[in-house]
Amino acid sequence: MTTESNAYRGLAWVAAMALFMQSLDATILNTALPAISSDLHKPAFEMQMAIIAYSLAVALFIPLTAWAAAKFGTLTVFRSAVFTFILGSVACAAASNLESLILARVIQGIGGAFMMPVARLAIIQAVPKQQLVNAWNLMATAGLIGPILGPILGGWLVIHASWHWIFLINIPIGALGILASGSVMNNIKGKAEKLDWTGFLLFALGLVGITLGLDLLGESQHNSSVTYSILVVGILLLVTYCGYAKNNENAILPLSLFRTRTFRLGIIANIFIRLSASGVPFLLPLMFQLSFGYSAEMSGWLLAPIALISVMLKILIGRILNRWGYKTTLISSALLMAGSVISMAWLDKQSSLTWIICNLMWYGACMSIIFTSINTLAVGDLSKQQSGTGSTVLSIVQQVGIGFGIAVSSIILNLYRHFFSASDCLPQAFSYTFLTSSLFVIALVWSLMKLHKHDGDHLRKMP
């Protein structure tokens, strides 16, 4: 029994290493962007695709994970995914221009897309139900630590080593995961269903077109007719996918899920949350370093409280939902989140560090509550047969939303930068960007108002 328990714990540790590496990577890059842009001879305001490319690659390849694991086996796919992630990390460190960095981030994202879903699948297949909670908790802890350490470690490495090390640190962690997985993870295969390649290509190319179009829209040096053409083609491809998948239950992302009202509203709300607030972790390091004159290390320490308060608040969210219900909690959190983003518009280099930290903790608390609430509500009414696909769609929307949120924030910031053309007007450009981004909360609250008072009651412990 002890040997079996150790084997399950070992599998959880391997999954935890992968999740730690991935969650660390999600936040470590932001504080290093100004340093990277300087080395690559690109304006820091044009570096957003280095972040967006990763999120987009993850979103595109998540739908293939179950098929790949069934066809090739969990161990084979997991090791290949970690190796791909390491390969992408090395390529990032070796990048000599923005284009090569973006390509390397895509490689990283492909590895990241397969890494965690397959690790979770391996745990579900191998760990007995009575030990499943312990395995999840161990893995989740690593996922919570990564975002806290990411900004701090990223800033420290930029100052005391070089930005290349924010990618190179993945090599020992990933190598350990590859070696350890051989002794604790079985190569379990299954029946690989026929993959919907038509749907995958329509969906993938549509997302790439929209994301690339939005990115080019924020860069004035590109031909506007080409930019709008790419954007329109991307939208048309996604519309075509919707028509294709409407009556096709075997589509890679079946639209029948959207017949469930709470799932539909949860997806819509997720998009508006990302548009209103996901650009904040991208904008803040730029503002701290380029406008306030803070070092990368100071910037990293200031960003850490966002993740820290988010983790600390997790234990209270259940009580909040039990007391107030989903609709009231979500609308209140959305309005408070808007307030936190608006208040960032009044931050300047004279602002006290105490006020800045309080402001960012306010933002982190709201984001923690709203994401946990909307994500549990979105999948809460799905049937057991739909829950796996529903979780996949939710993960895709979250990654796409991050990319869209950063792209839109970048567009808004660049518009204000060109409007306030004087070099000393950069603080105003950031202020107006935060104010404009907060307007998406109007659409968010509109979508949340469509929830019913008792939605999610079956997920609560009623007082």
Swiss-Prot record:
Keywords: Cell inner membrane, Cell membrane, Membrane, Transmembrane, Transmembrane helix, Transport
Membrane topology note: Multi-pass membrane protein
Any Gene Ontology biological process: transmembrane transport
Subcellular location: Cell inner membrane
Domain of life the protein comes from: Bacteria
PROSITE patterns: MFS
Membrane spanning residue stretches: 10-30, 49-69, 82-102, 107-127, 139-159, 165-185, 197-217, 225-245, 267-287, 298-318, 328-348, 354-374, 393-413, 429-449
GO cellular component: a single term: plasma membrane
Pfam families for the chain: MFS_1
UniProt GO molecular function: transmembrane transporter activity
Family: Belongs to the major facilitator superfamily. EmrB family.
Protein name (record): Probable transport protein HsrA
Gene of this entry: hsrA
